[in-house]
């Protein structure tokens, strides 16, 4: 995906404008909040419909027109890039691997989630990226399957869970920040969970 204002688009990329809004038919676009206009310092979300699995995400952050400071999270606020500064005209490319899942285990079985989990980004059919920070700036985004990387599974309670809303946070959603794109972190933790409830809700089966 090409987020620049350049008229020429690199081969293999899709041009993104402020009118590129997510819908299921298109399968990608700005989501959840107003679209980014390329200049605003407001946070924004970009979603892509992809099957379950691990995905290598490569972002080029920065802008030819202004300095930036960008934080990148995925799904339910899993932290991957924290406060990355870029000077005017500077571009920095970073890669990380995101685990994407939904509730489906098989044709006859799915994970049992609590009512409060139903709207969590962790359990929908999209891979959603959040661009935040003092001045989020992005030039390009590439997403590709990463089937061969190992996956670290996290199970736990409210001290580990991916919290959707600030200012709440737990160590599990900060964990990906410390790993390269050669490993995926799949956080299945949820508030109030124990070993017995993980088995009863089929969380272990989904993992």
Describe the role of every protein-language-model region.
Residues 1-166:
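Compositionally biased, intrinsically disordered or flexible polar/acidic segments
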Residues 133-136, 144-206:
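Conserved SGNH/GDSL esterase-like catalytic core that processes O-acyl groups on lipids
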